[in-house]
């Protein structure tokens, strides 16, 4: 496949990037529209998570990067720019480029953002998303995730349940307890703001 055909195929996909509150990562300030790397592009295929790349990912890997920030950005590739370069990261779950276009910004704390992500096919088989929402106490997002999880069988939400307890989100705890295996060797109980673990004899 020629490089032009490859780029056209890649550009036809929808990509995402998670940004923090200030949308500044490792000294690079992201803005709406075209963002161009301000130093030399790293095109070494063996490198991973290195300077010299503007990173982005596909929908089915996005759940791995939820801790990176609070905003979800749509990413487009400016393949018509003759200076555009990109590479698949050696980790296999993201890409790096010397320039990207940032589109719509959505708030990951908003349930509507998750309705959008579900419609686009976010990976809910892994529990990253559920654990994240439970840790930060986003009850409506937890409910939405559980409603759309195919593998939410009994006991699958154990880590999410423990995170909700640890961070004191009692409403999430109450919701998730029906999904947790109560026949385990220990029980978690909230006492005020403290977590108490009772081991069964």
From Swiss-Prot:
ANK repeat spans: 125-154, 156-188
Pfam families xrefs: Ank_2
Coiled coil: none
Keyword Repeat: yes
Top-rank taxon, per record: Viruses
Keywords: ANK repeat, Repeat
InterPro entries found in the cross-reference section: Ankyrin_rpt, Ankyrin_rpt-contain_sf
Designated name of the protein: Putative ankyrin repeat protein R868
Organism from which the protein derives: Acanthamoeba polyphaga mimivirus
């Amino acid at each position: 496949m020629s490089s032009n055909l490859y780029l056209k195929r890649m550009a036809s996909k929808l990509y995402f990037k998670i940004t923090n509150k200030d949308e500044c990562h490792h000294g690079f300030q992201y803005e709406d529209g075209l963002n161009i790397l301000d130093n030399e592009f790293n095109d070494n295929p063996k490198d991973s998570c290195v300077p010299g790349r503007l990173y982005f990912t596909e929908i089915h890997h996005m759940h791995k990067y939820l801790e990176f920030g609070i905003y979800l950005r749509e990413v487009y590739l400016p393949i018509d720019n003759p200076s555009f370069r990109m590479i698949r990261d050696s980790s296999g779950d993201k890409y790096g480029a010397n320039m990207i276009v940032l589109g719509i910004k959505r708030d990951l704390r908003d349930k509507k953002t998750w309705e959008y992500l579900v419609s686009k096919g976010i990976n809910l088989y892994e529990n990253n998303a559920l654990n994240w929402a439970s840790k930060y106490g986003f009850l409506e997002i937890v409910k939405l995730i559980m409603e759309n999880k195919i593998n939410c069988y009994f006991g699958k939400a154990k880590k999410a349940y423990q995170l909700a307890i640890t961070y004191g989100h009692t409403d999430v705890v109450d919701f998730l307890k029906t999904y947790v295996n109560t026949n385990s060797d220990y029980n978690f109980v909230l006492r005020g703001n403290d977590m108490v673990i009772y081991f069964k004899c």
